[in-house]
Amino acid sequence: RYRLTILVRGLSDGFDDEAWVTQIARPYMYELCNELVWPIAIATLSGSTMLIRQTTDHRSPLAVEKRGPGFRVAILGSASGIAYLTWCPKEQRDALLDLLAKSKRTEDQSAANRKKVNDLLLETRKRGYAAWRRPRRVSDELSLSVPILAGERLLASLTIRFSSTAVPEAEAIRRFIPRLRATAQRIGE
């Protein structure tokens, strides 16, 4: 079966984010979800938040909290947002951090500590993936995210969510990160 690549689709009239997510990324996401079972999502920048464009929550029996397209997460309060900030162009990153630092939303306030944020982004780039832990009553939810790049252009973040009691973080990094990277590369080709 043949599929158009991101770069080829970008040449067509009327191409938009929704088209590439549904036509190019979704089959790869489903394949990855079938393999790893945990929910997978693609998020893009939308204003001052990350917008979930596509998820496999409805296909994953392990998705405790179902999130669908249109769900928004904070840039500095999510693995997808941290991955996006890490790999976006410096000018865009600086503008986003300035915007977030002025925000009234609690989840954006950490942007005011630019040194701390820059240290986080440097560590994320060094590791090659973003990580985020969200406390929950029963078990923390961990998220790991990698960038989806078309050449040098950042398109989105590819993220997996899982329970910290079911999969310890070190094991998740070993098992999930290589598969996330491979899938992100296939989507971006």
Regions found by a protein language model. Name each.
Residues R3-L99:
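Amphipathic alpha-helical effector-binding/dimerization core
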Residues V8-L11, K102-S103, S163-V167:
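A short, flexible beta-alpha/helix-coil linker loop
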Residues A25-L32, L97-S145, E189:
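Short, basic/aromatic recognition patches
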Residues V37, R93, K126-A130, Q185:
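Generic structural signal for secondary-structure transition and capping sites
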Residues A41, S143-S145, S157:
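Short glycine-aspartate micro-motif
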Residues T55-D57, P135, T159-I160:
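Short clusters of small/polar residues that mark proteolytic maturation junctions
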Residues R127, V138-D140, L155-E189:
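Juxtadomain coupling helices with adjacent low-complexity linkers
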Residues I148-G151:
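Sensor-regulatory modules in signal-transduction proteins
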